[in-house]
């Protein structure tokens, strides 16, 4: 969508980890995972405006952080060396995805910047090259570049498309920020879940999140939100938290739960997507 001042609007959807297992720790300190990633229609909007002077300007960094450490800025900076001509861009972020929630908001914004600027700047990078570049920005970035629901392995950069039934999700965000680094370095974290061959959505059930027990121990507010949501059905934490969610087969069922929990918590009602909106552009 074009805006009067020359900006163009692009979607950056959130994700849920419907299953997350840690299968080992690598020599470089990162962890190998296996996870089901699902796109949802809760999304940020990234506004981009091209410049021809080589400058990258992020107009509204998240939480007042310096623009140089923002993932969207870093994504644009990363691509500049591949641009055919001196290229710049102005970036605005309309945030709807809560930060520090396990929903991948910052990573999704960065992936959208990479996908759009790869075209605008005629960088010519393949999807695989974008995925490899995006992995340097964050573990969730490759999935958003892949753009389809997926079973992920490695550090999240080995992706196979997965067929996930259409579902609605109720997402609850407790009033706490979870430190991903703290959870990944916790002595009690499970790091040896059995690795599987490429599964189907059905044969991975019951779903689990290997980080959930540690987060519940260190952040009681997440446990409380999980306990509340579990009253209505099977609940699970996404990513390293803090959000927890439950799935429903139809919107009415999900909305009824949403009405109840939104009186107690910041809550979201979201529909699952089969592919990234930019794949249709």
Curated annotation (Swiss-Prot):
Active site (record annotation): 15, 140
Keywords: ATP-binding, Isoprene biosynthesis, Kinase, Nucleotide-binding, Transferase
Biological function: Catalyzes the phosphorylation of the position 2 hydroxy group of 4-diphosphocytidyl-2C-methyl-D-erythritol.
Pathway: Isoprenoid biosynthesis; isopentenyl diphosphate biosynthesis via DXP pathway; isopentenyl diphosphate from 1-deoxy-D-xylulose 5-phosphate: step 3/6
Record-linked Pfam families: GHMP_kinases_C (PF08544), GHMP_kinases_N (PF00288)
Matches recorded under InterPro entries: GHMP_kinase_C_dom, GHMP_kinase_C_sf, GHMP_kinase_N_dom, IspE, Ribosomal_Su5_D2-typ_SF, Ribsml_uS5_D2-typ_fold_subgr
Protein name: 4-diphosphocytidyl-2-C-methyl-D-erythritol kinase
Similarity remark: Belongs to the GHMP kinase family. IspE subfamily.
EC number, UniProt record: 2.7.1.148
Recorded catalytic activity of this chain's protein: 4-CDP-2-C-methyl-D-erythritol + ATP = 4-CDP-2-C-methyl-D-erythritol 2-phosphate + ADP + H(+)
Record's keyword annotation contains Transmembrane: no
Organism expressing this protein natively: Neisseria meningitidis serogroup B (strain ATCC BAA-335 / MC58)
UniProt keyword Magnesium present: no
GO molecular function: 4-(cytidine 5'-diphospho)-2-C-methyl-D-erythritol kinase activity; ATP binding
Gene: ispE
Residues bound to ATP: 98-108
Stored Gene3D superfamilies: 3.30.230.10, GHMP kinase, C-terminal domain (3.30.70.890)
GO biological process entries: isopentenyl diphosphate biosynthetic process, methylerythritol 4-phosphate pathway; terpenoid biosynthetic process
Organism taxonomic ancestry: Bacteria, Pseudomonadati, Pseudomonadota, Betaproteobacteria, Neisseriales
């Amino acid at each position: 969508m074009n805006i009067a001042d020359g900006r163009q609007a692009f979607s950056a959807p959130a994700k849920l980890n419907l299953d997350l297992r840690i299968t080992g720790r690598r020599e470089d300190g990162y962890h190998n995972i296996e996870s089901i990633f699902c796109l949802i229609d809760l999304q940020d909007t990234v506004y981009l405006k091209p410049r021809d002077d080589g400058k990258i300007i992020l107009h509204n960094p998240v939480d007042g952080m310096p623009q140089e450490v923002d993932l969207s800025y870093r994504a644009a900076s990363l691509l500049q060396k591949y641009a055919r001509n001196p290229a710049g861009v102005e970036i605005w972020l309309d945030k709807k995805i809560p930060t520090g929630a396990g929903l991948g908001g910052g990573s999704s914004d960065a992936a959208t910047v990479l996908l759009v600027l790869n075209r605008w700047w005629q960088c010519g990078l393949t999807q695989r090259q974008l995925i490899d570049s995006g992995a340097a920005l964050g573990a969730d970035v490759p999935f958003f570049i892949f753009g389809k629901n997926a079973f992920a392995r490695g550090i999240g950069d080995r992706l196979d498309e997965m067929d996930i039934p259409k579902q609605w999700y109720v997402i609850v965000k407790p009033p706490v920020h979870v430190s991903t680094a703290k959870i990944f370095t916790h002595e009690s974290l499970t790091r040896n879940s059995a690795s599987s061959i490429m599964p189907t959505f059905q044969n991975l059930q019951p779903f689990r999140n290997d980080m959930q027990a540690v987060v519940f121990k260190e952040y009681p507010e997440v446990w409380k939100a999980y306990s509340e949501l579990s009253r209505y059905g099977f609940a699970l934490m996404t990513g390293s938290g803090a959000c927890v969610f439950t799935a429903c087969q139809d919107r009415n069922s999900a909305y009824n739960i949403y009405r109840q929990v939104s009186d107690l918590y910041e809550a979201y009602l979201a529909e699952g997507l089969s592919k990234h909106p930019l794949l249709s552009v």
